[in-house]
């Protein structure tokens, strides 16, 4: 009986030990991911401009969104936006700081008349989005500057011809002998632009299978590799490429099926390898969403419910063996259906020049429920669209900021009209690879290097040697004043360091901020403000830009496809068309907007008096007779708003102070209109 009891006790201890060991492994995964997340920027900044092409002498208006790096909701961590614009030679042409309120900053950049035509980059940095060890420049917006839009050809710059680059990517990371494998490939022209290719896989110089790219130079081929055989790929142009190393034993990790409800993976290992525990961890943007554990002998299938991931985006699955070593990795795009649906309805179909337009905007979630959203809208001539800039908030948040390298035409993967977009997305994830997480088992957690501040920081020094001892180990007062006369005070500590907080800057905003030491002149005080822009430049110049690209030849090809169809006998086949007049090239001039404003500012034009009546709008109609003017002072007059309704009145003088009202009308105000030539 004792032996049975002892045996039962030993088995119980072993069982508990295994359970605890497995639980410790899972806890280790959670801890490692959490510690790794703490060292990375907690914010992501997205920049939106009011258009893509600008003429010199005008303003660029922008809106910057500070987003939580995990949920992509608005973040309130950073309070100051550092913004600068770089030219094609990477020289700074503009830099400024803007306040961030509730995660949003907006403002404008003046495009100087002396700017040279070309491509420029607008870059944004915040305290919690840009660290001193940031690997790539993420928060940017490429724009184009021209002297006059009428002289812009719209054609792309000629790219230098470079040797074809052909890369191979085994699914899961490695090719293992005897295990079915999928090999993704990607072909580019060396500038990052895709090249369609086709070729043949040779085994021991015998053709085994043919293949060709299916989207943007990317494709996939399947085979089972063996040790001791010679493998190579030959493209149609005759160039030959070797395959990655084939391992004699190991594991393979493949995505078998994927739909809205779940993802099914298959894990395989070489025959004869002992059975072992494996762990599959799923995370999204640094947050662990699920961990699965199983026993692997030869093959193991694991199903992961898609509902484990709360957001749309890239899910990273990492496979660990029984010793908690990462073996393979696979990226999967989940919940593409989780998106906002925005509908815009105009109050009418056609408008005359300078007529007021009313929009009704409705925003719903993927379930059709109305939700509150922070939106931006800009209206401009479509000639100012930059076809070379394919970036938008979806591509920036879900792709560009999440995977390595430069992505060509990322908007393709979010356009529901592209029926193969999810298959193309899977190819992209197989070839681009993961960007940012490094497993750190057994090492101290790393915390990223924050160096920017939201405040104005500086130091006060005393130049007088005689008086310097009097200020040692004491705090000194500094006055902070705004342009409108508002002032406040801050203290410099015993070392002379001081900060002007964001709340104080908000109270005195409206122009320049002036700082004045309160020490008398005999101390010879001097204030030095820390300028973080030079430090930003020293960091960003060593970082590659991963801004997405667009092949303009594809854009031009699409424009050609939109043109009328030409038959074999050179006649143009048209749908039913009603010709009303001879078409004319639109007249555009960079100064017209400015002239329109000047015309509307004409001092002799209509105005709204202090009582709210419209004056000088229609001959014979005045809100007040000339012998009895408005009792409210003239400085209360205001400019009428286009499209608003106002009352106008027509009076008849009966003699003395007597008068009668002959007519009263409620009219819609429309400003004076001018022809383009005027």
Name what the model sees in each region:
Residues 120-124, 231, 315-317:
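A short tyrosine-centered beta-strand micro-motif
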Residues 40-44, 85-95, 202-206, 215, ...:
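Short beta-strand and strand-turn-strand segments in soluble, beta-rich domains
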Residues 24-43, 53-55, 59-98, 131-133:
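Contiguous segments within soluble domain cores/interaction surfaces
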Residues 1-29:
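Bacterial Sec-dependent N-terminal signal peptides
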Residues 64, 94-111, 207, 212-225, ...:
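Glycine-centered loop-to-beta-strand initiation motif
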Residues 38, 55, 76, 112-117, ...:
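Surface-exposed, low-complexity/disordered segments
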């Amino acid at each position: 009986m004792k032996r049975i009891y002892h045996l039962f006790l030993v088995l119980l201890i072993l069982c508990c030990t295994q359970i605890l060991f497995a639980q410790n492994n899972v806890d280790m995964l959670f801890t490692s991911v959490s510690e790794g997340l703490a060292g990375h920027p907690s914010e992501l900044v997205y920049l939106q401009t009011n258009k893509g092409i600008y003429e010199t002498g005008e303003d660029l208006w922008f809106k910057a969104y500070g987003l939580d790096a995990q949920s992509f909701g608005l973040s309130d961590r950073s309070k100051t936006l550092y913004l600068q614009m770089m030219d094609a030679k990477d020289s700074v042409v503009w830099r400024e700081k803007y306040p961030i309120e509730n995660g949003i900053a907006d403002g404008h950049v003046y495009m100087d008349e002396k700017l040279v035509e070309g491509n420029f980059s607008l870059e944004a940095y915040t305290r919690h989005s840009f660290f001193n060890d940031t690997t790539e420049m993420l928060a940017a917006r490429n724009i184009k500057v021209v002297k006059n839009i009428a002289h812009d050809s719209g054609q792309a710059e000629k790219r230098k011809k470079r040797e074809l680059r052909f890369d191979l990517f085994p699914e899961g990371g490695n090719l293992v002998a005897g295990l079915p494998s999928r090999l993704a490939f990607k072909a580019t022209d060396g500038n990052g632009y895709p090249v369609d290719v086709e070729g043949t896989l040779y085994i021991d110089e015998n053709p085994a299978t043919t293949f060709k790219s299916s989207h943007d130079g990317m494709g996939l081929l399947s085979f089972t590799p063996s040790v001791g055989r010679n493998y190579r790929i030959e493209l149609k142009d005759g160039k030959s490429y070797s395959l990655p190393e084939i391992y004699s034993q190991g594991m393979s990790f493949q995505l078998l099926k994927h739909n809205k409800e779940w993802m099914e993976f298959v894990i395989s290992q070489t025959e004869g390898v002992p059975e072992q525990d494996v762990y599959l961890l799923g995370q999204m943007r640094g947050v662990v969403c699920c961990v699965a554990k199983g026993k692997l002998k030869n093959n193991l299938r694991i199903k992961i419910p898609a509902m484990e991931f709360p957001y749309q985006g890239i899910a990273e699955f990492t496979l660990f063996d029984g010793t908690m070593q990462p073996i393979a990795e696979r990226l999967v795009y989940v919940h593409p259906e989780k998106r906002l649906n925005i509908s815009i309805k105009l109050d009418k179909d056609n408008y005359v020049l300078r007529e007021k337009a009313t929009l009704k905007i409705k925003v719903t979630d993927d379930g059709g429920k109305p939700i509150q959203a922070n939106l931006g809208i800009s209206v401009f001539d479509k000639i100012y669209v930059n076809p070379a800039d394919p970036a938008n908030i979806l591509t920036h948040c879900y792709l560009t900021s999440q995977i390595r390298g430069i992505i060509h035409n990322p908007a393709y993967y979010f356009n529901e009209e592209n029926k193969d977009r999810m298959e193309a997305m899977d190819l992209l994830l197989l070839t681009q690879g993961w960007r940012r997480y490094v497993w750190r088992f057994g090492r101290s957690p790393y915390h990223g290097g924050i160096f920017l501040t939201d405040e104005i920081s500086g130091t006060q020094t005393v130049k007088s040697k005689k008086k310097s001892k009097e200020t040692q180990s004491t705090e000194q007062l500094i006055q902070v004043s705004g342009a409108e006369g508002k002032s406040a005070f801050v203290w410099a500590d015993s070392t002379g360091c001081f900060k002007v907080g964001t709340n104080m800057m908000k109270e005195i905003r409206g122009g320049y901020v002036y700082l004045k030491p309160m020490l008398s002149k005999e101390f010879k005080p001097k204030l030095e403000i820390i300028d973080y822009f030079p430090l930003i430049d020293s960091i960003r110049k060593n970082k590659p830009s991963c801004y997405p690209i667009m092949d303009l030849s594809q854009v031009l090809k699409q424009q050609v496809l939109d043109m009328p169809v030409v038959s074999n006998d050179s006649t143009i086949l048209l749908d039913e068309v009603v010709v009303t007049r001879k078409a004319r090239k639109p007249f555009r001039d960079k100064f017209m907007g400015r002239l329109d404003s000047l015309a509307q500012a004409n001092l002799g034009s209509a105005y709204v008096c202090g009582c709210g009546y419209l004056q000088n709008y229609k001959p014979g109609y005045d809100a007040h007779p000339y012998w009895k003017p408005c009792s409210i002072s003239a400085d209360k007059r205001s400019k009428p708003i286009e499209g608003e309704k106002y009352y106008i009145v027509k009076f008849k003088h009966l003699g003395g102070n007597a008068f009668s009202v002959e007519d009263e009308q409620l009219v819609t105000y429309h400003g004076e209109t001018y022809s383009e030539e005027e």
